[in-house]
Amino acid sequence: MTHTNLAKETLLQFMQAMYSWERKATRSLRNQADKEMLKDELAAIFDQFCRSKKTLREREVSLSVRFPFDYKLETHPIVDEEYDGNQTYLYIKENRSGLETLYRFRMVFQKGKGWIDKKEWLDDGKWINSSL
């Protein structure tokens, strides 16, 4: 499997896991006992798919969820890709009520596995760091 295909597969699996978590979180965040469970589940998702960078994982602290969801595959398609050495960039377009945002995920490869290393969004021609 090529690095680009591995990167896509990793990102799509991450997005599916996050979408499931977001759906569950919208129903469960009001209950304090559920918050700990949701935090543990989110940490497990990040551990499985992401490099351990605090900037990526801010959602573990806030447990925030937006609606419409951030990781619904049907509304956040991969629209482009670039391969550069040991990393692949995957671009996702989000459309919220007519407002389009382009996100870029940097995927790196270690020990035969693809990892999410960075998420950014395009603002006025510049890439700005974003948390997951």
Where on the chain are the PLM-derived regions?
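Hydrophobic beta-strand residues in large extracellular and virion-surface proteins
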Residues: F14, I78, L90-I92, F105-M107, ...
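Short beta-strand edge/turn micro-motifs at domain boundaries
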Residues: E100-S131
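Short, aromatic-enriched amphipathic alpha-helices that serve as compact interaction elements
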Residues: T2-A25
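Surface-exposed, charged secondary-structure patches
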Residues: E41-E100
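Short, charged low-complexity linear motifs
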Residues: M1, K35, E100-L102
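A structured, charge-rich N-terminal accessory region that forms the first stable segment of a protein
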Residues: A17-E58
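Exposed alpha-helical structural elements
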Residues: L6, T10, M37, E41-I45, ...
